[in-house]
């Protein structure tokens, strides 16, 4: 079972505008959608759609927390969140004139007792894999992430900001930075796919068994120590990019859980991410066409 931990989940609202945004005037959206989100929440939803056993935990509070609970229950996602006195944040993505504007809140402060309660949930569930992902709200440090990794005999996956990744002290089975996070974590030149592969391989040696780096339109790189693989992105119309990295990670994790090799896991991750970016919002995509997309993804070995 995969247990996702999201200390800073969010209600996501996505607004589309037919006209460019401009200051000092009211801009009226032509459409709006609302999703339960936060990186770990996204991963739990995607894994569930991919028929991989998953439970979402973390911290929820207020009206947005209630919305996330309701939405997860309605979509069949198992959840075991800890209630907080604060209000879960509401993030906004505005899409106008071909541009995405992402407006995120830092999140409400979380007290030490609530953090300890989340760690207790992880212990009680005894998962095979724990996925800790997303930003950390005020009051939560990477010490909490290390505590989760050290609390039991499970694989721990992290998907966090680059600065946070550098302060982790435990050993992790997988790290999933994007290109900017990989650059912040390593200080390396990541302007090319090959540069990203070298940076991922170097970063792996700091405490990660594998590094899965998402590169946007350049695809994804996986460094395992013995090899480095690159999977190219597919050329499709992009409606939105929010949640693409979570979809990539979920597809790869689901494939590995089914016993797939690394190449198949990369193909699956890219295919799931491709389906997601073809729609607006972070709700799990319809998986029709997944197999056909997976067959189109090319994977090559890079110099490690």
Language-model-detected regions and their locations in the chain:
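Glycine-rich phosphate/adenosyl-contacting loop at the front of the ribokinase-like
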Residues: 1-57
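Hydrophobic anchor at the start of a short beta-strand
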Residues: 2, 52-54, 79, 156, ...
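Conserved N-terminal subdomain of the carbohydrate kinase-like
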Residues: 19, 48-129, 293-304
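Short, conserved phosphate/pyrophosphate- and ester-handling motifs at nucleotide-, phospho-/glycolipid
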Residues: 47, 178, 245
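Short beta-strands and strand-loop turn motifs
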Residues: 102-104, 127-135, 159-160, 176-181
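Short, small-residue-enriched loops and turns at beta-alpha junctions
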Residues: 108-111, 136-140, 164-166, 183-184, ...
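Conserved phosphate/ATP/ADP-binding segment of small-molecule kinases
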Residues: 146-226
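Conserved post-catalytic alpha-helical subdomain immediately downstream of the catalytic base
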Residues: 206-210, 215-217, 232-300
């Amino acid at each position: 079972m995969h247990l996702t931990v999201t200390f800073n989940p969010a209600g996501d609202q996505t607004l589309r505008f037919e006209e460019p945004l401009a200051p000092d005037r009211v801009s009226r959206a032509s459409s709006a959608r609302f999703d339960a989100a936060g990186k770990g929440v996204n991963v739990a939803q995607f894994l569930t759609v991919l028929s991989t056993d998953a439970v979402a935990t973390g911290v929820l509070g207020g009206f947005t927390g209630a919305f996330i609970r309701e939405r997860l229950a309605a979509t069949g996602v198992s959840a075991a969140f800890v209630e907080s006195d604060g209000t879960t944040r509401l993030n906004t993505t505005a899409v106008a004139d071909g541009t995405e504007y992402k407006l995120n809140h830092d999140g409400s402060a979380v007290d030490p007792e609530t953090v300890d309660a989340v760690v207790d949930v992880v212990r009680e569930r005894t998962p095979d894999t724990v996925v800790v992902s997303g930003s950390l709200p005020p009051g939560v440090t990477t010490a909490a992430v290390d505590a989760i990794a050290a609390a039991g005999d499970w694989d721990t996956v992290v998907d966090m900001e680059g600065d946070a990744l550098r302060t982790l002290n435990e050993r992790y089975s997988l790290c999933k930075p994007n290109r900017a996070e990989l650059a912040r974590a390593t200080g390396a030149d990541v302007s090319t796919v090959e540069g990203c592969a070298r940076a991922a391989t170097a970063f792996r040696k700091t405490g990660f068994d594998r590094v899965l780096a998402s590169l946007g339109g350049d695809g994804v790189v996986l460094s395992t120590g013995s090899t480095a693989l690159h999977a190219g992105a597919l050329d499709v119309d992009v409606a939105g990019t929010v949640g693409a990295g979570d979809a990539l990670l979920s597809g790869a994790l689901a494939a590995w859980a089914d016993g797939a090799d690394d190449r198949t896991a990369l193909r699956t991750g890219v295919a799931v991410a491709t389906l997601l970016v073809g729609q607006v919002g972070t709700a799990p995509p319809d998986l029709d066409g997944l197999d056909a997309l997976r067959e189109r993804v090319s994977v090559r070995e890079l110099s490690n």
